[in-house]
Regions:
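Flexible phosphate-sensing "switch/lid" loops adjacent to ATP/NTP-binding sites
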Residues: 1-145
């Protein structure tokens, strides 16, 4: 798992580099980020949305991007709301309270997605989000350890 001290510190690039290294070394490798927040998304061949960073990480692995590589995506939409994308499909706009009320369901989706990748690939390079030291978010954190 790749973690950092905050947002914008290079986790996505480092994850892509590890993906490429292990792919070139002959491993069947895939990227994974449980939850991502970004204004822009990548649209798969199936018309599903996922994080752009996970899309280029998939390409570094020699793979077509799949939404299980980034099962939950939040797109800030203003007024403390975010559009929630689950497995590539929009679920509507939610504030933090409404989003966290679905924590158990989201955790199941994240776990199922990771399990599917682990069954298909020899290595799964996991990217964390923000900082794992944000104690106030620990109870709801789906992305870090």
């Amino acid at each position: 798992m790749i973690q950092g001290t905050g947002s914008g510190v290079g986790k996505s690039l480092l994850t892509a580099a590890f993906c490429r290294y292990f792919y070139k070394a002959g491993y069947k490798v895939a990227p994974f980020k449980a939850q991502n927040m970004a204004l822009n998304s990548f649209v798969t061949e199936r018309g599903e949305e996922m994080g752009r960073a996970q899309a280029y990480q998939a390409e570094a692995c020699g793979l077509k991007p799949e939404v299980i590589m980034n099962p939950i995506m939040l797109k800030p939409s203003g007024n403390n709301n975010s559009q929630v994308i689950v497995l590539g499909k929009p679920e509507g706009s939610r504030n933090a309270k409404d989003f966290y009320a679905r924590h158990i369901r989201h955790k199941e989706i994240v776990t199922q997605s990771l399990d599917e990748l682990r069954n298909k690939y020899e290595l799964v390079i996991i990217e964390g989000a923000g900082s794992p030291a944000e104690i106030n978010l620990r109870e709801w954190d789906l992305v870090n350890m």
